[in-house]
Amino acid sequence: MTDHSHENWRPASNPWAVAIVVTLAVFMEILDTTIVNVALPHVAGSLSASYDESTWVLTSYLVANGIVLPISAFLSRLFGRKQFFLICIVMFTICSFLCGIATELWQIILFRILQGFFGGGLQPTQQSVLLDYFKPEDRGKAFGLSSIAIIVAPVLGPTLGGWITDNYSWRWVFFINIPVGIVTVLAIYQLLEDPPWESKSKEKLSVDWTGIGLIALGLGCLQVMLDRGEDEDWFNSNFTRTFAVLTLIGIIGAIYWLLYAKKPVVDLHCMKDKNFAVSSLLMAGMAMILYGSSVVIPQLAQQDLGYTATWSGLVLSPGAILIVLTIPLVLKLMPIVQTRWIIAFGFACLATAFFWSRTLTPDIDFETLVLFRSAQSIGLGFLFVPLTTIAFISIPRRLNADAAALFTMFRNVAGSVGISLSTAAITERSQAHSAHLATHTSAFDEPFQQTIRELAQAIQNFTTQVGDPTGIATGRMYQAMIEQSRFLAYVDVFTILSVVALLLIPFCLLLSPVKSEGSAGAH
């Protein structure tokens, strides 16, 4: 079949029915990356393991998931896209069941590795399906549907996981995947079909074991380093330094091999497309901001403001809803406003929203915290669909699968980097602020000593049943200093995220205006 006939290929099934089903599968997979987080203490207790050991339940999933992402296009061609997608969902569902019945920690870690491996093929395959099933002018709407899964699932995960664990058992965190998996398998079997350029391609494919090995080494070690780095005191430990060296060897070796190999496992030619390359960079930056803030804000709510897991989830939920409501407006704007200006506006909104944190105080209430997150969500709503649409606008159909795999990989890896850097910055900046404030708490600092005397007097006036009012007052002052240091650290992280968003705006201007019909246009 000629390239021209490939471009004119249209699926027999309703594209929207297919889009809903494949997005449901991706929603299930993304939900699984966060739903387990709050259940870890229960998993550790049930399986007689320490909390630190139980965190490998998360790490193992992320490592396997990250390795498969870039090679999913090759696997899709090897097995056929429909068959590969079905294998991924079936095995993901089976592994979910096995995780739920595990009786030893090593068992659940093994099944999570397999679950992450098969789950890693879902996101890029879903995106390539949307690219092939929808005309360029309709892709914006399809990506809008996909964005809902990417946005809502990570936010819903901790809240749903906490509710399930509190009311039932941690095992049901895995069991809820089973009915969703069964429904999606049956629907995809009926609806999905392979495009002609991928059908039976496995007959002419050879396996690039070197490329696969280098990718597995580089991305696998990177995910371990990012996920375990803070617990291992980052580069002060031999563990982190070793994995950093292995990461560099794997990634540099993989790039060199993929560029010069005759039949590489990942086709990097799509990176020659300027819009795709710049959009990938911008999506990576947005993912760093989104995932970093999505971890830091609940951490602030739970550890410093005393919120439950459910209430901290509710802090994020209105923002997720706001993004979903913003998407139709963005789709209306895309045919009449240059896409690069919409993206630049989104990053400007993000920068402004995060800079607002400098006006917040440690006694912030629930409503203000929700507004703070919602302000960020307005900017995020102007980024998801335009970035994804313009990234693929000029990619040839034969490269859709490779481009989707790389685009998803950039987003997920950058998200992991954002989480690790944000949590590490909280610790480092908290210590720095504590050291600074401690210089004002000596016995020779008269304002501090005066405050101690006044607080001690107030305690003594309130009740006489105290042994040492001055000691109690001093303890409270030091506790207040620690709380103030922690809050200032959060403000510092939000300020850094604001600067990152600001620095990304000039890159939006590198996007080439592309004339196209409807919402796909970036004219």
Kindly label every feature range from the protein language model.
Residues 1-26, 193, 256, 263, ...:
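Transmembrane-helix exit segments and adjacent C-terminal regions of multi-pass membrane proteins
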Residues 13-73, 77, 85, 96, ...:
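Transmembrane core module of solute transporters
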Residues 27, 59-63, 90, 144-152, ...:
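Transmembrane alpha-helical cores of Major Facilitator Superfamily
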Residues 186-205, 256-265, 362, 428, ...:
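Helix-loop junctions on the cytosolic side of multi-pass membrane transporters
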Residues 179-197, 216-228, 246-260, 507-512:
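C-terminal membrane-cytosol helix-exit motif in multi-pass small-molecule transporters
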Residues 166-178, 228-240, 308, 427-499:
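A membrane-interface helix-boundary motif in multi-pass transporters
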Residues 69-212, 228, 237-238:
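Helix-loop-helix hairpins in multi-pass membrane proteins, especially solute transporters
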Residues 147-150, 155-158, 293, 369-453:
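Small-residue-rich alpha-helical segments with characteristic i,i+4
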